[in-house]
Amino acid sequence: MRDRLKDPVKIFEINKGKRPVHIAAPMVRYSKLPFRQLVRDYNTDIVYTPMILAKEFLHPKGRYFDFSTNDADASLILQFGVDDPVILEKAAQLVGPYVDGIGINCGCPQTWAIQEGIGSALLDEPEKVHKLVRAVKSTLGESFCTEVKIRIAKDLNKTRHLMQVIEKSGADIITVHGRTRQDRSSFPVNLDAIREVRPCVQIPVVANGDVKSLRKGLEIAKYTETQGIMSARGLLENPALFAGYEETPWGCVERFLWYSTSYSLNFHLFYHHLTTMMGQMTTKRERMTIPKDSFASVMDWLDEHFVVRRPDEPMFGESVLPCRRY
């Protein structure tokens, strides 16, 4: 039985009128269990899995490869890439007992996703989105948290209509990415668009795009009048973002090392996470010397250059600044 207080809807209720809910975005490859555990240590309220293809999730090998969790992995929303309500019903039935919510991806702009009829291809099919929401609700119950993530359209009336369809379908949360599916990630997020469409529904709306710091996120929430803020790249660079740190604290790196070994994170993902979060505490030249062959060799490199505390040592995971060895 999942903890009712970890229900994403309950979290929005608890924070109403206080502060926006802090959310770690679904990131392909990167939103794995060790990273989810890490950002929770730093004031992240809700975390997502990477987008998982629902049709692959129906196969045991697909589930094993894409999804792992534990009792501490809450509040957790699993995001599906899906266009078939029947497949979604089956996938929801399999995963329902192990998550706190299911998200439906209607925002992925990648060409392959659009060709598959998932992600932002669904922005043009409100009726299908309605059926997908109903598939989750009919399978897991009306009280089970269901979220839909969308992008804005060039015609905001189209976005408003889709949001209203989503709300009437019974969804509990809508996340709005402030770029169109044609916009590159380097294109500035359109906060005015999020601000304009938010009042068209009564359920919580989350602003997504360019949340690179807590300060920036709070400014976005205030301007758009949204109830939540979602960060992706900002959290990759600084998993302690929602705790107010402007740069990754050293203790965050120590915790990440521990979680990665505890949950056997894929080495290539581990390497990318580590070098990204150490971007502001090391030079590019230094990072180029970090070994690329094994976790053990990376640990040797870190121990050679920094004081790295282990979980059984005082001040593990608490330091702000790294202590270098010279």
Curated annotation (Swiss-Prot):
The keyword ATP-binding does not apply. Its cofactor is FMN. Belongs to the Dus family. Dus4 subfamily. The active site is at 108 (proton donor). This is tRNA-dihydrouridine(20a/20b) synthase [NAD(P)+]. It comes from Schizosaccharomyces pombe (strain 972 / ATCC 24843). Its main location: mitochondrion. The keyword tRNA-binding does not apply. Keywords: Flavoprotein, FMN, Mitochondrion, mRNA processing, NAD, NADP, Oxidoreductase, tRNA processing. It is an enzyme of class 1 (oxidoreductase). The lineage of its organism: Eukaryota, Fungi, Dikarya, Ascomycota, Taphrinomycotina. It is found in: Mitochondrion.
